[in-house]
Amino acid sequence: MIKVREVLEKNLEDDEFSILQLCRELAVSRTQLYRKFKSVSNKTIADYFKTLRLHKAKFLLSTSGMNVTEAAFATGFKNLSYFSREFLAEFGKNPNEFRRKY
């Protein structure tokens, strides 16, 4: 799990990073990775990666002076409405409201 997190964090801004690339980097099959990940987490790898990206975006919005668009793109989100929807679902505020607070 630690190695998975390290690889995912290293690739947060890469909107093209895939599960297949993760498997290659970890030298495991997709099936092995899904099984192992599911046994220690209640999320899929894709959901976990999205959560990491959202938390990084939240951090950037509160500390870096980035606007919402910059934070979304810096964390691998290409679609701003998708980013806003997922941010709201994760944190209970849309990213613009959150940004205004900081």
Predicted regions and their residues:
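Short coil turns linking two alpha-helices in DNA-binding domains
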Residues: 29-30, 78-79
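Alpha-helical residues within helix-turn-helix
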Residues: 20-21, 32, 70
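Non-catalytic interaction/regulatory modules that flank or connect domains
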Residues: 17, 23-28
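Basic, amphipathic alpha-helical hairpins
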Residues: 5-17, 37, 41, 58-67, ...
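Short hydrophobic/aromatic patch on the recognition helix
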Residues: 32-33, 82-83, 87
